[in-house]
Amino acid sequence: MELSKPFHRKKIVVIFLACILIFSGLSARVVYLMVFRAAHYSELALDLHQRERKIKAKRGRILDRNGIVLADNQPVCTISVIHNQIRDPNAVIALLCSKLGLSEETVRKRVEKVSSIEKIKSNVDLETGEEIYRTGLDGIKVDEDYKRYYPYENLASKVIGFTGGDNQGILALESRYEEVLSGQEGLILEMTDARGVRLLDEGESRVEPVDGKDLYISLDANIQLYAQQLAEQVCLEKEAESVSILVLRPDNGEILAMADVPEYQLNDPFTLPEGQREQLMTEKEKQEALNKMWRNACINDTYEPGSAFKVITAAAALENGVVREEDSFQCPGYIVVEGRKIRCAKVRGHGTENFVQGTMNSCNPVFVTVGLRMGADTFYQSMKQFGLLNRTGIDVPGEAGTIMHAQDQIGPVELATISFGQSFQITPIQLAATVSSLINGGTRITPHLGLYCEKTDGSERISVQKETEQKRILSEETSARLRSILFQVVENGGGKNGKVEGYQVGGKTATSETLPRGTGRYISSFLGFAPADDPKVLALCIIRNPQGVYYGGLVAAPVVRELFENILPYLDEIEYYEKNETVNRK
């Protein structure tokens, strides 16, 4: 018994010391949390009773060069529910199903979800939003928002693009200039009680949104409209698969029009054209059909340019001194290269002709001869110098690149076919940009649509054009000689259907058979520019798989002629010329 007393005392001391240690530790922890971590936990406590709401910024508009609005904003509503504020869930569900056209299952799932705020539907028209707001049902929130609206529906749809449900750019310029157009969202911080109900006495903290900037582009809505109407007309008349018309300024690369028919409805971009059985498609098939509908063949697709490429062959040959205008050629209707007979469009041949006449006649044997004179290395280096082997750098996403033989794979047959525009592929925008650079005095241009952006109040204007080096790719003398030859093509040669009364027009026709050969499918095109001695505008018309007559000089040249007849008087810089006035060489 005597032995147990010291043991109990020791036990009590140990327990006492342990209690002191535990209490000291707890005290230290409390001091640490209350003093050193006070700010952190105050912030957490504040977060528990704060609700953050975003304020949408108004998206910048897209306007043509003259200030015509092509993409605008339409005020709409976003309908949401706040779970903790709902007193009559069934009434809320019934109202939202009725007004928004949603299924009960969809609405109930969102209404019964425990969250601070749950979006039910966006892009609701103002009238419907007002009707919902006036019911006064607790827990329903109606916020003003914006959705994209395109006043001209399908005008330049493949250039402008569209936005998604969150108003973010998806395609074309809407996507490329997202950073300029989108602006910055604002913010509202509200104090709430434990149930998430806003405390009106506490007020709110607010950061105003910054609206997006307006984007001005080089398109001229009037020229675009006329080009698009012409493309639709010829597409219908020739029962063609599609028609593209490009109009640009060869001096600086500004695109005045880019039509690629059929265009699509910008305000309803997910609906396929009539005639396509959408209801019978799988999701994958429908997406593929939509992607095809949205594609811009001027930029996204390549093709064999055919005889229009002879402009580039001529420029390279003249610049390298392998041909002169007066050089004589013989055309029996074909030319043999390494045992392969390459035919001319004129089966009986053109007989004796000089280089200018060979270009006017679009004679394949003449251009094969010239190409072989240059040789593969010289021709390839010329194409490289002209910028033909790179992308143009146009400010629209998805530009395709040139598909060309590797330099060491170009033999005599390949060189022969390249010289008249076959066995390789380029984009229409590349052809238009390269020819523009060759006829403008020899300076490479970058085709573009963006001009500048500015705040909606006009207080700040910023150029969006990418600075590019003004690279000389051809001498001014060769450029002038080339323009003179192409003027003769329209005045007295195969391009005479592109002639415009009162103006001097230069140009080149083209007719190319699509791959695989022998299917009877052709691409007809005509490239024209005016005035011939000092070009201010260039147009390229491409008709894919026209039915009936398919020669470029007969079906595409008249389209450019009609285009020029209507837009040349409209362009201030173009001067009228007397019918018999000759082109001036510079």
Locate each region found by the language model.
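Beta-lactam-recognizing serine transpeptidase/beta-lactamase-like catalytic domain environment
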Residues: 71, 193-204, 250-308, 312-545, ...
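Periplasmic/cell-envelope proteins involved in peptidoglycan metabolism and beta-lactam response
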Residues: 1-277, 302, 324, 377-389, ...
